């Protein structure tokens, strides 16, 4: 039996950066709080836990004072920073720069679309940490779309600025875009300035799909290892499964 490990497998650069930041702090203090799982990988979370990393949730945060807390790569809403300031919590911010850029884009887009009585649409997974952070930038005043069925919430007569969670499938994002265009065309609304689709997908993630398809096609069986809670992992596994039906998900 010949086994090949995909040379591109592993954590994304944002997660690697967060882990490195945690490790550096743990070398100094042997204890650090982390707001949510640093990565959707039980083995890695266990390893860091043994080094002194303690995972807390957002409800816990308000009960901590005068300490250090790591912000993971997913990013956070403004409310998290407000609590930290009020409780004298020092934040070690490992928010992914791609996510931070998207947060800024959504804030600016919200200002612009509000001037023309438009609406913000975010394509993403409900309850996902990144999505919570994105919606928090505009106090939740957006339409969250997880599937084509969710588009019924939209007012297609009004301008639309659309953004995507960074780890979603490019193919699925394109399908959402095309469906919105179709419905607007049916209403005879074709002004391109009133439907702005922002390319906010992470290049590292979106670039993995074609690589994985090639990798999957040249092997008899694919064993895909990922955390069950990883949106990125689920999306990439589906790419493998579509290319090679003998693909199996293990967490």
Question: Model segments located where?
Answer:
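The feature marks the mature, well-folded catalytic cores of soluble enzymes
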Residues: 1-251
